[in-house]
Amino acid sequence: MIRRQNSAFNPKLFAFLIHSFSYLNLPQYPQRNLRVISVITGEIKSKIDQIWDAFASGGISNPLEVIEQMTYLLFIRRLDEIQITKEKKANRLKTAVEKPIFTPEQDHLRWSKFITLGDPTQLYSTIANEVFPFIKSIGSEDDTTYSHHMKDARFTIPNAALLTKVVDLLAAVPMDDKDTKGDIYEYMLGKIASAGRNGQFRTPRHIIKMIVELMQPKPTDTICDPACGTAGFLVAASEYLNEHHSTEIFANPEAAKRFSEETFFGYDFDSTMLRIGSMNMMLHGVENPSIENRDSLSEAHSHIESQFSLILANPPFAGSLDYESCAKNIQAIVKTKKTELLFLALFLRLRWIKLKNKLS
């Protein structure tokens, strides 16, 4: 974590920075009351493991595909929870439901409705032929980030027996507490980490929270993760802003629009990660972040710079690139094929553009 001391960019400093992080005089931040880390119980982990085993027995063993299909189902469940909250508020205020997710004609598409069907064949037909197309269409009228990445989404659970088992197991997992939801999802993402696909290793959620707390993002920040994966850093930043600056970010329609559309930027070249990241952001109230399919290290995208005031990221620590495929302005900072060092060079380049930018 480095704060910029002056505006003169000197690429030769990079080698010094790489070898001297432990000797830097890092800024001192006031002591903060970081939130207590909640840990899911062994019973909940066992339920998630049972779901994982069910997918494997049903012919889906790719960890990323399992995560993707489970995310769709969790997303569907969360949409119903949001609708229920809206309905309770409307009943309390004696008003109409504000921006309902489901119309009365779509009531049967809600999680709380279809899990009571009882007939596995009918359940499969409802989810595969109605619910999944419904979640793919959300935001399509406005061509949002979410709808863009969902265009190629596929429902790959092959049969009614597997779907019924997975839905029943997921329904038994308690998700009333926000931290528990996050811990459950982190535990699921740990399955990707154990697979080690394409250098995709999750950053533990409590580490992400700590970094965001130290950086103290503000409503005026433009926040970027050039290797965003499932958008964990961006989600944590949005939660921080909601908790500490809710009055400012929702002060008026223009401020709310800026928060939703002009604050968060994430890049990744894995389409599955982009879909999961978009859903993750949407579930946390950021409806249209700029999450794009980009290889941040490539020459084709060497222009991404200048608009970011805060970089939050954990570089991939696996793999290497050919010199020819890497952006020249990154190679000018460090001559290496290692992706973790190339990403550090990218972070420094992005951070160095503006005075007082921050990097963590």
Annotate each language-model stretch with its function:
Residues D322-T336:
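A mobile, often basic/glycine-rich helix-loop segment
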